[in-house]
Amino acid sequence: EDFNTGTAAALAGGMTKILAKPNKSPPLTTDAAMALAVGVARRNARCDVALFAGASPEDIDQLAALGERSIALKIYLNDTFGKLRVDDVPTLRACFARWPRSKVIAMHAEKQSVAVGIGLSAVYDRHVHFCHISRREEIELIADAKQRGLKVTCEVTPHHLFLSQEDGPRLGPFGDMRPILGTADDVAALWQHLNNTIDCVATDHAPHTRAEKLSATPPPGVPLGGNGALSPHAGSGHVYTHRGWQARPDDEE
């Protein structure tokens, strides 16, 4: 996939703007890599595009320049596709101290890592956005943080709303994603918080091919950018996916 095909698929699915993740080749952790991506997007994109910068211990000195070209800084606190995991305190402190205060810091954080992100938000008084939340313990902790006035927001994906670990045997490698699918109880918790704690629904689109997913070493992630999988209907608390209009479990009779 490239900016041409990816944005065309987004438009086919009813989306007019995409936010591209930084775990690309090359990763968007330097001003040079960001400039390259911006140039390619300008020449090929069919809809509006914004780019995430990536946090990297080796490129901390690039944060100021990256802030001028990107919509937000994304910090990976857990393993996912690519090699952008940040697991040392000095790098985290540098990111929160040096990233422009007018820009959001987004985090891929799972389980106890969410507590790390909330703590950093409190210490540095900064807006932290948690990407693709998938567990009851995570969403309840974020709800507690919001009730205390901390500057945190979060999102959930269609696959974490509509699939669980029970679907694993049926999906095989196509059900392998990061964060991994939760339990049925986790799914229920996400629906319970959809109209209050959760700020938006996002695809976490990962454009791996069928051949890649069926290989001996399938990459995690699923392509959700252009198949009509996402169209939130916030007023009624329903979400439209390829399955049709879906009500929250507690709304069903």
Predicted regions and their residues:
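Divalent-metal coordination cores built from histidine and acidic residues
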Residues: 7-102
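Active-site neighborhood of phospho(di)ester-bond hydrolases with catalytic His/Asp-centered motifs
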Residues: 19-22, 27, 51-53, 106-107, ...
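Conserved beta-strand segments of alpha/beta enzyme cores
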Residues: 48, 151-153, 249
